[in-house]
Amino acid sequence: MALRFPPRLLSQLKLSRRLNSLPAPVSEDSEDESLKFPSNDLLLRTSSNDLEGSYIPADRRFYNTLLKKCTVFKLLIQGRIVHAHILQSIFRHDIVMGNTLLNMYAKCGSLEEARKVFEKMPQRDFVTWTTLISGYSQHDRPCDALLFFNQMLRFGYSPNEFTLSSVIKAAAAERRGCCGHQLHGFCVKCGFDSNVHVGSALLDLYTRYGLMDDAQLVFDALESRNDVSWNALIAGHARRSGTEKALELFQGMLRDGFRPSHFSYASLFGACSSTGFLEQGKWVHAYMIKSGEKLVAFAGNTLLDMYAKSGSIHDARKIFDRLAKRDVVSWNSLLTAYAQHGFGKEAVWWFEEMRRVGIRPNEISFLSVLTACSHSGLLDEGWHYYELMKKDGIVPEAWHYVTVVDLLGRAGDLNRALRFIEEMPIEPTAAIWKALLNACRMHKNTELGAYAAEHVFELDPDDPGPHVILYNIYASGGRWNDAARVRKKMKESGVKKEPACSWVEIENAIHMFVANDERHPQREEIARKWEEVLAKIKELGYVPDTSHVIVHVDQQEREVNLQYHSEKIALAFALLNTPPGSTIHIKKNIRVCGDCHTAIKLASKVVGREIIVRDTNRFHHFKDGNCSCKDYW
């Protein structure tokens, strides 16, 4: 990139062209005169169309202008050339010139050269120290930033707000949360605790380590607030799943007239995604559109993920289509969305489209398409992409192997899945054996299931999931003694099954239910509603699958137990409290059991609604008596 200078300095534009052909700059102490640069007189006698033969003597302002241009446009080579000429001038020991050079090298990322300038400066002031500290902080050298800050204090220099904000950022990056209170106290001592720049840095440090009360105290103490301080606090609460507080602060920020950044939007979309606050996320998205913000990749990718995780795959696709620019994260987000929703053929099509437009798939891309193939029964396609990944030079990681085992296992090729595990170049992880165990549950292979379970217990004895799966395998085969042995082992080792719960969001409120829930104020209406639905689905052929009841009781009691699983209660509640014909969204913290899957599938037909259920494995779109998974899950 060429330097662009004011008209008065057009003649000096020839410097870059002329000097690029000269030797590389050398130290001012070099004894080799042949490597020295020509004199200032020769260099500054340049020609241009309008300043033929004119002479402009170099002064501090001239050199500063050159260096600032080099800094702005990150022209490190030209900056070195200017530096070499300063060394031949009367400004070689000038403190202002030294600070400008130091800043140029630091901003261009050449920190070693910046440090050499610093060390050779005969005089330094607080600007000198601050510039070097800021350079280290901005270029991921937090240890050096903290080291030079300590030296600065030892030499008796007083920091300003920019010094302190850089040091606080360095402490945050260095994961020295313990330094936060010490630095905060130092800022109070120096009188900078209410400064907006220092306060914003402290906010970021405290929120990174979850010290939200301390962050709020800093925020409240600020004499004035800017968009950085607002965004830092919003992002902090969003990261810590304080979605409601983050949304409350977002509204306060708007009332105070500040403009949200793309970082704020991304934080809020991410928080709404992780906590299931779809309606609030839609409101933030609507405000973003109203304010005229472009949907750039950073916030757009998070918004796409929010819609996908909330069950709105079509909205996720719309966001992808509207992105001003798509990066590999954008494509991966779309692929992951299709994988989670079980749309394997669509994921395969978009993966090929990604390659066609020149975006090189990475390890996440391949993981997503493998997952999509696994969830859709696309065995041949999945194996093709596993081989393609290796051809593309991407070394499979543990999660890729998990997905391939899942792919083979779901397809019923359990022996091939076992051989694949035994021949892997890595030691099988608990997750890999668990994938085989799940496949054994699906295909009722008791012996191989027990073999896989033993490996999981050895590698991850505290995970209750594999114990429950093995119990269900034994129970479904009528092997109650073996099932009882599993329960006894769980009790003796202190492993407890995670309580199942389901929840729905209605009118910006989350309603959570557990099995046999007796606490809800509408419990009687909920029970009547489910009995009504149950009678209708039985007319369509529903028969309770009592193999999913993990307690050994008589058949009648097992059937009663089945009808009060948390997802069925959540469905009945949603039917009572949402408009007829509207889509119902239910989320569950563990895998949906087979009986509930069948019941909800038939319920979608008798109530005439689309019901979207998200569990830990995937999304199920129930509509007109069918499920998007095609019962392959």
From Swiss-Prot:
Gene Ontology terms: cellular component: mitochondrion
- Specify the domain of life of the species encoding this protein: Eukaryota
What keywords is this UniProt entry annotated with?
Answer: Mitochondrion, Repeat, Transit peptide
Q: What Gene Ontology terms for biological process does this UniProt record contain?
A: RNA modification
Region (Type E motif) residue ranges read: 432-507
SUPFAM superfamilies per record: TPR-like
Q: Where is the transit peptide?
A: 1-63
Compartments annotated for it: namely:
Mitochondrion
For this chain, one GO molecular function annotation is: zinc ion binding
- Please list where the region (Type E(+) motif) is annotated: 508-538
Each PPR repeat, start to end: 94-124, 125-159, 160-194, 195-225, 226-260, 261-295, 296-326, 327-361, 362-396, 397-431
- Positions of region (Type DYW motif): 539-633
User: What Gene3D superfamilies does UniProt report for this protein, alphabetically?
Assistant: Tetratricopeptide repeat domain
Instruction: Spell out the NCBIfam families in the cross-references.
Output: PPR (TIGR00756)
* Family listed: Belongs to the PPR family. PCMP-H subfamily.
Q: What is this protein called?
A: Pentatricopeptide repeat-containing protein At3g24000, mitochondrial
